Amino acid sequence: MAKLLLLTLLGASLAFVGERLLAFRNSFGAVQELEPVEPQNCVLIEGLENGSEDIDILPSGLAFISSGLKYPGMPNFAPDEPGKIFLIDMNEKNPRAQELEISNGFEKESFNPHGISTFIDKDHTVYLYVVNHPHMKSTVEIFKFEEQQRSLVHLKTIKHELLKSVNNIVVLGPEQFYATRDHYFTNYVLALLEMFLDLHWTSVLFYSPKEVKVVAKGFSSANGITVSLDKKYVYVADATAKNVHVMEKHDNWDLTELKVIHLDTLVDNLSVDPATGDILAGCHPNGMKLLNYNPEDPPGSEVLRIQNVLSEKPRVSTVYTNDGSVLQGSTVASVYQGKILIGTIFHKTLYCVL
């Protein structure tokens, strides 16, 4: 009887592991084939060779870019170099990347920028908020942008016990922002186990100097986050669940889920087209190739546009797809006046005229 029970438990365990392995491979797009969709007028931006994980474009057309992210399990072509923030003027005929100088007093050697978000104050001062992972911790850095000097002045470092494994942020007021937590565990092995078991323990946080709280939870891997043009709705990407959550924002900053838009790809960062209100999503169509990077068979890139977000049937269309021959590991796409920038975790940056 004991042997029979043991064999039954062993069989059930093996069946569970097999099911999770198959689900894990499928969730990371291990079998997805890519059909190329590429605008004709595209060029790679010179000087951006080590990633452009997140991009935020001001109404003036100045684009901030975080570069050089060192993320557990992901490739990095310049592991000994600190991260950087670049600026691109989308109004230029041939846009070029310019590294922004950071003021003294900030620990540049451990700068590891991830998600970014801009905020323009009433006096038109531009502030850049950056998710930073110094020594693989999570902080949010606040910089003031000096446009004439093309530099960043570091103002403040935000730390909090809830701000762990932070991926992205969207700023809605002075020191008021939503942040996504992409893993419950900060240990890399436990984080992998968390993904393997699909625990849905990640969340969205709200931060202000007076209050820090969880405002939405139950995500497989909360990733990109942005806000609608009228600031009434918050859009959250759940990467490994392959969907986008549409959340209503309340006066107390709590979020209520209205709908979920299902996509057949791993969703990373989100942005909103300022002309239409459409969501643009940087995606990973074959995420398993990110975890097992092979330069001979690189991960591809994909950008989706979601129109009529609040309708019963949002329309999803493909803006860009590449098998990795041009662009590897896309994370974000941001548009300005018919032009688009597509960023990556560790690779290059693509500029296209749509």
Swiss-Prot record:
The catalysed reaction is: a phenyl acetate + H2O = a phenol + acetate + H(+); An aryl dialkyl phosphate + H2O = dialkyl phosphate + an aryl alcohol; an N-acyl-L-homoserine lactone + H2O = an N-acyl-L-homoserine + H(+)
What family name appears in the similarity comment? Belongs to the paraoxonase family.
Residues that carry a glycan: 50, 269
Query: What Gene Ontology terms describe where this protein resides (cellular component)?
Result: extracellular space
**Cofactor: how bound:** Binds 2 calcium ions per subunit.
Among the GO biological process terms of this entry, one is: response to toxic substance
Describe PTMs of this protein.
Answer: Glycosylated.
This protein's assembly is summarised as:
Homodimer.
Give the species: Oryctolagus cuniculus (Rabbit)
Positions of the catalytic residues: 114 (proton acceptor)
Task: Tell me its cofactors.
Answer: Ca(2+)
Record GO terms (molecular function): acyl-L-homoserine-lactone lactonohydrolase activity; aryldialkylphosphatase activity; arylesterase activity; metal ion binding
Q: What is its main location?
A: secreted
Q: Which residues carry this modification: Phosphoserine?
A: 165
Q: What does the entry list as the binding residues for Ca(2+) 2?
A: 54, 116, 168
Q: Kindly list the places in or outside the cell where this protein is found, as annotated in its UniProt entry.
A: Secreted, Extracellular space
Q: Which gene encodes it?
A: PON3
Taken from the UniProt record, the cysteine pairs bridged by disulfide bonds within this chain are 42-352
Stated EC number for the protein is 3.1.1.2, 3.1.1.81, 3.1.8.1
Task: Supply the name of the protein.
Answer: Serum paraoxonase/lactonase 3
